[in-house]
Amino acid sequence: MKKYIFDVDGTLTPSRKMIAFDFLPFFYEFIQSNDVYLVTGSDREKTYEQVTPGIYNACKRVYNCSGSDVYEGDVNVYRDTWELPKKVERFLRCELDFSLFPLRNGKHIEKRPGNVNFSILGRGGDINF
């Protein structure tokens, strides 16, 4: 059986959005006859929202958080235990405090298994101003 690896954001779905409803039946059928793997920078909860639990659990394996949190269906088969060092977190907060970028919206430091997402604007921020 052939193996297929798909990125989620910007490939299967528009970035941070849900998969197209009319694409779901085709993709689910495709998963049933192929070994399908998903790879995403997002966490499991966000990926569930984007591709639906049915698609998520039908995949052979899903690599969340850039491969730092891995699932086979509902079973967590790997999770990186790395944590953001306090010194690095302080540095990021200083960068945020001293940035001249005027807009602030949303979460600036998002800790995930095995990595961290940092944004001056903030997660959930709107760049269309």
Regions found by a protein language model. Name each.
Residues 3-5, 61, 69, 117:
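Residues embedded in well-ordered beta-strands
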Residues 17-108:
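Active-site phosphate-binding/coordination module
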Residues 2, 88-95, 118-121:
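Generic low-polarity alpha-helical segments
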Residues 102-129:
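Conserved acidic, metal-coordinating active-site core of Asp-based
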Residues 1-4, 22-25, 119-127:
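Short amphipathic alpha-helical segments, especially helix-boundary/capping motifs
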Residues 11, 68, 123:
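Short glycine-rich anion-binding loops that position phosphate/pyrophosphate groups of nucleotides
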Residues 2-19, 38:
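Asp-based phosphoryl-transfer active-site loop
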